[in-house]
Amino acid sequence: MPQGLDSKVATRFPGTHLVSLADLDEYKKKLYKKDHASRCPGLVKVDFYGDAKPTWALVLISGENPKRKAELVVARQVDGDWEIRSLETTDGTPVVWREGPGKYEGLYEEEKTIHAPNPVIVFCGYGSWAIVYAWNGKEVEKVWLSD
């Protein structure tokens, strides 16, 4: 985690830690490593806002399964400080990665299609769900890719 962001996260989200490979069960660890090698499953650098400022997506967890809580946050460095936005909270031990700009169609008919001009954040609970988050220039949009 970048210097300065770690202390900001510790202050704002006490009692949490980044999801690591050690937090995943063997099956989920195998799935993650197959696609992402040995990268940290709870941290990814992503140009989410399209402004080239240092920006990271983090999955912070607290507690133990089956009562574990997870929160997806995006942190962007602006003028030397970190701007942190919470995108989602859920149960379990999800992972995060980035995908490129493009078209992302929602799983459900009522969901719109996102046309992401910048890289997107994928928040995934293996074997259960995956959600794509994109910045459209004004707000964060999300669609479910699987359920």
List each language-model region with its residue ranges:
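Acidic, glycine-anchored loop motifs typical of Ca2+
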Residues: 46-56
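Beta-strand C-termini and the immediately following turn/loop, strongest in propeller blades
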Residues: 59-62
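Structural motif
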Residues: 64-74, 128-132
